[in-house]
Design a protein with these regions (language model features):
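Structural/interface elements that position substrates and couple domains in central-metabolism enzymes
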Residues: 97, 101-107
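Histidine-centered active-site/metal-ligand motif
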Residues: 1, 48, 132
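Conserved short loop/turn motifs at secondary-structure junctions
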Residues: 92-95
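Rossmann-fold dinucleotide-binding core
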Residues: 20-89
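Single conserved hydrophobic/aromatic residue that forms the stacking wall/gate
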Residues: 1-12
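Short phosphate-engaging motifs
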Residues: 30, 104, 147
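Helix-to-beta-strand junctions that scaffold the AdoMet/dcAdoMet cofactor pocket
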Residues: 16-17
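NAD(P)-dependent Rossmann-like dehydrogenase/reductase catalytic/cofactor-binding core
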Residues: 69-73, 79-90, 109, 113-114, ...
Length: 199
């Protein structure tokens, strides 16, 4: 939420020491959108963690006015936190991995809303072909359907609009994925974790 982020920036810039580096963990808002509000845009950079229980990647994404000397400092911090730092050289909503992930999720959503295949068969196809433990809909349940909806509901292409509408029906029923016990699958024992899911 951009307004809330701007309000926090006012508090931080008054209380933080002058040499303090400000970072944001936002997933889709660009640091340049609120860098000026930090009061120190040259000391502001995106430092984005993925789910630390599953991933060790931290994205470092400077905005055009970030002091380049911050990059090695943040890379070193990432390594000290047992993360693998990746540098996003140009601002991009979704960084690197989330951009690729949303392409996968978008394709899976298009297949489902176009009635090309079922949730289970879309996931099976992905899991078998790439030797993965879950497919796109299992991933969506892990991310949270509400989170996925926040990303997709402003997209304007026909497939994204249809998929956002489908996600909203789940959200309206309180089915947000793994965190609520049900999304595209039921938890704690979703079908894709059963040995007979892929036969």
């Amino acid at each position: 939420d951009l307004v809330r982020s701007r309000g926090l920036g006012d508090v931080y810039k008054r209380q933080a020491p002058k040499n303090c580096i400000f970072t944001t963990n936002t997933s889709y808002m660009l640091a340049s959108m609120f860098a000026e509000d930090s009061g120190r845009p040259e000391k502001f950079c995106a430092f984005h963690f993925h789910d630390v229980f599953y991933s060790r990647v931290v994205d470092i994404m400077p905005h055009p006015h970030t002091d380049p000397t911050l990059i090695p400092i943040l890379e070193d911090l990432g390594r000290k936190l047992n993360q693998v730092p990746v540098l996003v050289k140009r601002e991009n909503p979704g960084y690197i991995f989330n951009t690729m992930l949303m392409a996968l999720i978008g394709a899976a959503g298009k297949l489902l809303t176009g009635e090309v295949a079922s949730v289970e068969d879309i996931d099976r196809s992905w899991m078998v072909n790439f030797h993965m433990q879950m497919g796109p809909f299992g991933i969506l349940d892990s991310i949270g359907l509400d989170t996925a909806w926040h990303v997709t509901h402003n997209m304007t292409d026909r497939a994204s609009v249809a998929f956002a509408a489908l996600l909203k029906t789940y959200i309206d029923q309180g089915k947000l994925g793994e965190k609520t016990g049900e999304g595209f699958y039921k938890y704690p024992n979703p079908a894709y974790r059963n040995p007979d899911f892929i036969v």
